[in-house]
């Protein structure tokens, strides 16, 4: 994970330059992947709130003999389901996953099918996915999944609230804090947060680490080559506690489901949130709201290179699936990532896409803005829950939440994380 993490992070820069600058006409002839004969049903595990049904319907219309049995999970449920299934030795035929340390255990244990160069060519993966996006999904130099989306995460603000109070988008960290102070004085929650499960709070914590430690040290922390018990990280955790004390988050956020955070903006109770482009298709447009009222900004970490948090999302395949089920699952991923299929479904399926030449649809200003950033203005760093080994993610979450609750000081929390890092590294010697 450690050298892989750094390589993945470096590959993001290349992906940012290429992903939306390559036109669909540059794609080579589509591959002709094998189609199972007879009636075949394969299982697919995916996030319930993601628009998989759009592609399932298109796929099943194109291949009437093939059926997708979609089992729906929440974000945290699918993580648990994969852990349980891998321990039992019985996975789905295909499943949605993230990358980094969230996918590595299944790759290392032999559950995830390696997509060899031959398989990549057979299913058009090498032609239809931007090459650098494939690098993002690789683990130890090998590919174990087909990238579907790339997801930057950053600060969004509600324009109508900012306009009401004469506020402008903050471009520096100091400006951000002044905006928070003003909003708080007006009775508006500055930043909506759903702290249950810890990963939404992590987005803010990661932002603070990026600000105080800088990109180079942040990457070294992920690689376990720098100490979490350092002045820079302590400052980040101190800032987290300060924001809690000042009431910059909604009261009781530590127990709020992340899904309940965005409604605080929709109800004009909060003005900002750390989120990703998926809210455009999954929340804002379905609510018949104007997506132009929810504006993503580059989270002002005051660092060079300019970075925000982000990750890729992929489909993986079970090595022990029956041959026809495995072929059907691979064909499903190949179908979804065919440029013409991806482009005609982009409005409903969501963006930014990892497919060559696929542009965000009209009427999607959030995706369009992020696509523009990723052409070179903004680079990405992995979120902690993908960058660190999963054994250490829990230690990070526990320390972070303890600071929020006031049961640990920032100094003690950082020392606790580093103690876990040292113990983990000792087991790898």
Q: Which sequence ranges carry the predicted segments?
A:
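Extracytoplasmic/periplasmic substrate-recognition and gating elements
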Residues: 61-62, 88, 165, 246, ...
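Hinge/lid segment of periplasmic solute-binding proteins
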Residues: 29-33, 100-153, 177, 203-206, ...
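A structural signal for short loop-to-beta-strand junctions that line the ligand-binding cleft
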Residues: 85, 92-93, 123-161, 189-192, ...
């Amino acid at each position: 994970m450690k050298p892989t993490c750094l390589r993945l992070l470096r590959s993001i820069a290349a992906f940012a330059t290429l992903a939306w600058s390559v036109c669909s006409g540059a794609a080579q002839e589509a591959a002709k992947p094998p189609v199972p004969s007879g009636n075949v049903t394969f299982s697919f595990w995916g996030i319930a709130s993601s628009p998989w049904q759009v592609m399932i319907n298109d796929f099943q219309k194109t291949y009437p003999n093939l059926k997708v049995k979609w089992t729906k999970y929440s974000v945290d449920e699918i993580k648990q389901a994969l852990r349980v299934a891998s321990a039992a030795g019985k996975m789905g035929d295909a499943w949605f996953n993230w990358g980094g340390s969230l996918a590595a255990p299944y790759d290392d244990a032999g559950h995830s099918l390696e997509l060899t160069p031959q398989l990549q060519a057979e299913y058009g993966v090498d032609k239809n996915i931007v090459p650098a996006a494939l690098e993002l999904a690789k683990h130890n130099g090998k590919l174990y999944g087909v990238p579907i989306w790339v997801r930057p995460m950053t600060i969004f603000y509600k324009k109508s609230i900012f306009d009401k109070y004469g506020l402008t988008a903050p471009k520096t960290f100091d400006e951000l804090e002044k905006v928070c102070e003003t909003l708080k004085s007006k009775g508006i929650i500055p930043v909506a947060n759903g702290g249950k499960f810890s990963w939404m709070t992590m987005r803010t914590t990661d932002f603070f680490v990026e600000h105080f430690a800088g990109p180079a040290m942040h990457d070294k922390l992920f690689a376990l080559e720098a100490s979490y018990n350092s002045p820079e990280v302590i400052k980040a955790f101190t800032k987290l506690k300060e924001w809690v004390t000042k009431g910059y988050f909604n009261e009781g956020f530590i127990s709020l489901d992340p899904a309940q955070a965005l409604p605080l903006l929709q109800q004009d109770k909060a003005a900002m949130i750390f989120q990703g482009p998926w809210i455009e298709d999954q929340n804002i447009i379905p609510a018949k709201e104007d997506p132009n009222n929810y504006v993503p900004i580059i989270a002002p970490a005051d660092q060079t290179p300019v970075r925000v948090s982000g990750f890729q999302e992929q489909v993986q395949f079970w090595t022990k699936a029956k041959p026809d089920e495995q072929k059907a699952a691979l064909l499903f991923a190949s179908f979804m990532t065919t440029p013409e299929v991806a482009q005609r479904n982009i409005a409903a399926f969501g963006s930014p896409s990892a497919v060559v030449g696929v542009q965000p649809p009209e009427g999607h200003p959030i995706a369009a803005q992020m696509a523009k950033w990723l052409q070179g203005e903004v680079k990405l760093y992995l979120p902690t829950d993908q960058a660190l080994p999963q054994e250490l993610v829990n230690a990070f979450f526990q320390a972070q939440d303890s600071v929020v609750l006031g049961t640990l000081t920032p100094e003690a929390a950082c020392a606790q994380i580093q103690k876990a890092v040292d113990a983990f590294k000792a087991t790898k010697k």
